[in-house]
Amino acid sequence: IELPSQQSLSLLAPDKKKESILRPMQLISGRIEENSTELVKYRHAPKFAPAGQSTQMIIGATRETDLQILRLSERLYQKYRLKRVFYSAYLPVAESPLLPALTTKPPLLREHRLYQADWLLRYYGFTSDELLDEKHPSFHPLVDPKCGWALNHPELFPVEVNRAPYETLLRVPGIGVKSACRIVTARRQGRLDYGALKKLGVVLKRAQYFITCSGKLADGL
C-alpha cells in the first residue's frame, strides 16, 4: 500500500490508484479462503500462500494521523485477512516541495507506537476507535497505547485479578496474552497475591496501578 490514503497517493504517486492496490489483495484473500476449503476436502491439496499476505505503510511522508493509519490497518485485517501490516518511518532521501525536508528526522517513536497499537488490534481485542478519536488522533510519544487507554478510562479500574475475565485482564497494562492465560489457569488452584503475579510474568511496575488482589492494592499505593 505504501501510502495510507488516496490523497497521499494522488499527491506523491499519481500513477497509482487505490483500487489497483486493493484488487490484488482481494483476489489473494479469496484464493486463500478457497484453498482452506480445498484443504478440508483434500488433505494433500497444495497450500496457497501459506504465509498469508502482508503490506507496508510509510509513516511521516504525508499528513495522515495515527487514527487514519490504524483505521486502515484494521480494515485490511478484517476485509482481506492480512497476516501483518508493517509500518516504516519515512527517511528523507530526496528534496521535494511535496515531502518533508531532508533535515527531518524519521519518526521512529511514532512507528513504534503504531506497532504497539497494531498488536493491540490483533491480539488484545481493541479497536482503533477505542485507542484514538477525532479529538486525540495521534498517540502520545511518551505513553504506550495500552497504558494511554487505561489512563483515559479510570472508571474501569482497578481490576480484581482473582475474578476478572480473560478479556478484561488483557486490557490491564503490564499483563500480556501469556500472563493473562497463566492467571486464569493459576487462580483455579487458589487465590493469587502480588508475589504470584510476578512469578506468572506480570509486569508489576505497570500493572500495580490498575489491579487489586483479593481487594487489596499493592503496598505503597
What are the functions of these language-model segments?
Residues 190-194:
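Short, basic-rich loop-to-helix N-cap that marks the start of a DNA-contacting helix
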Residues 195-199, 208:
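Short Lys/Arg-enriched helix C-cap and helix-to-coil transition segments
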Residues 100-170, 204-221:
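Long, highly charged, low-complexity intrinsically disordered interaction regions
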Residues 186-187:
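Residue-level signature of tetratricopeptide-repeat
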Residues 1-125:
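Conserved AdoMet/S-adenosylmethionine-binding subsite of the radical SAM
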